[in-house]
């Protein structure tokens, strides 16, 4: 397979390494990655790679589909909450997979994967992806109800169909899959990253600037764009372009609740909270997805933000200006929030823990520098 528009990210590098450890050949030329799976000879992902990347659990459905067995350890990733994988395992069991959990390892085996009816108690993106990957080569039909509706699910379904799968209903709450005997290689262009796009909109908005984003899908960003409009920014939306002009002083957001798509994404909550720290008035953030996604609050407070957290709610009272400080990113999106806040702060801000930011942002300092930011990496 050849994947285009594949960013340089720490998580992508780790994914490439997982594939190579499994026996696949991976070649990158710029933003094009080619994967040859014909030499795949292993069905186990080593613990050190699983520990570093939460999304590594998505390999489970694909490996069991191909090899009829798989061994992985419990995944790691950013420390933003419990994020149990029971939904993933329940979905695979519905397809006839026997799963044993022993000493931190997940051992899966089956004689054959058989289509079934999978109901997700929560519309988990990862569990939906795992179910899709396992079911595309199952015998018979599979129906996934209460499926995640995120644009990334649509993108995965389109990619699988390019390889010969028969998946329909992506983007809705019911996905139907007719199993095929095997998939074939394909060339596919990965969708633009809507969270990265929204982060750059936040970076421009907090400085009262103007920005033009190209190669984006505005239709996938509705909830985020509505919040920006409520804060007083001006937006001009074109097919694959967003042009934003921000006021000198942003308005408060009032109440933002993170929800599964098409609601407001949990992944952009932190950068938008950075916006609220210097907005006029009080904003309230209610985090409904992860129970530990306010780790950036203490660091923003070090910069002079006025934020009070109680349970899953954070009340942000806008201040006139933030002050530069030494802060530390403790997870990916919280790190992005610190970068956004630092752009508008008086003085110099030094951000540690940049390895978290590199998990989800390609050369963030390069693109911000091109937009006029004073930023460098040491």
Walk through the language-model features, giving the residues of each.
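Short, structured segments at the rim of ligand-binding sites
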Residues: 1-378
């Amino acid at each position: 397979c050849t994947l285009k528009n594949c960013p340089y990210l720490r998580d992508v590098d780790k994914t490439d390494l997982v594939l190579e450890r499994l026996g696949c050949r991976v070649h990158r030329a710029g933003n094009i990655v080619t994967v040859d799976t014909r030499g795949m000879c292993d069905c186990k992902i080593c613990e050190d790679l699983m520990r570093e990347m939460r999304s590594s659990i998505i390999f489970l459905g694909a490996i069991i589909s191909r090899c009829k067995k798989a061994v992985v350890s419990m995944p790691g990733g950013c420390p933003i909450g419990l994020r149990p994988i029971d939904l993933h395992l329940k979905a695979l069991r519905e397809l006839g997979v026997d799963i044993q959990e022993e000493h931190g390892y997940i051992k899966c085996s089956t004689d054959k994967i058989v289509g079934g009816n999978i109901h997700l108690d929560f519309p988990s993106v990862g569990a939906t992806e795992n179910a899709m990957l396992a079911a595309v080569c199952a015998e018979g039909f599979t129906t996934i109800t209460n499926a995640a509706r995120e644009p990334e699910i649509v993108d995965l379904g389109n990619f699988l169909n390019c390889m010969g799968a028969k998946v329909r209903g992506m983007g809705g709450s019911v996905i139907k899959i007719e199993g095929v005997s095997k998939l074939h290689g394909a060339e596919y262009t990965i969708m633009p990253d809507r969270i990265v796009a929204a982060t750059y909109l936040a970076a421009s908005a907090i400085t009262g600037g103007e920005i033009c984003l190209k190669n984006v899908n505005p239709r996938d960003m509705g909830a985020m764009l509505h919040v920006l409009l409520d804060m007083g920014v001006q937006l001009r939306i074109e097919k694959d372009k967003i042009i934003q002009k921000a006021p000198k002083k942003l308005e408060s957001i009032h109440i933002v609740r993170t929800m599964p798509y098409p609601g407001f994404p949990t992944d952009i909550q932190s950068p938008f909270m950075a916006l609220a720290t210097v907005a006029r008035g009080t904003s309230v953030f209610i985090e409904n997805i992860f129970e530990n996604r306010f780790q950036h609050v203490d660091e923003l407070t070090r910069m002079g933000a006025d934020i009070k957290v109680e349970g899953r709610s954070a009340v942000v009272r806008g201040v006139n200006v933030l002050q530069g400080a030494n802060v530390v990113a403790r997870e990916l999106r919280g790190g992005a929030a610190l970068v956004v806040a630092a752009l508008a702060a008086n003085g110099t801000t030094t951000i540690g823990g940049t390895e978290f930011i590199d998990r989800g942002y390609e050369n963030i300092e390069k693109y911000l520098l091109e937009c006029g930011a004073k930023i460098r990496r040491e």
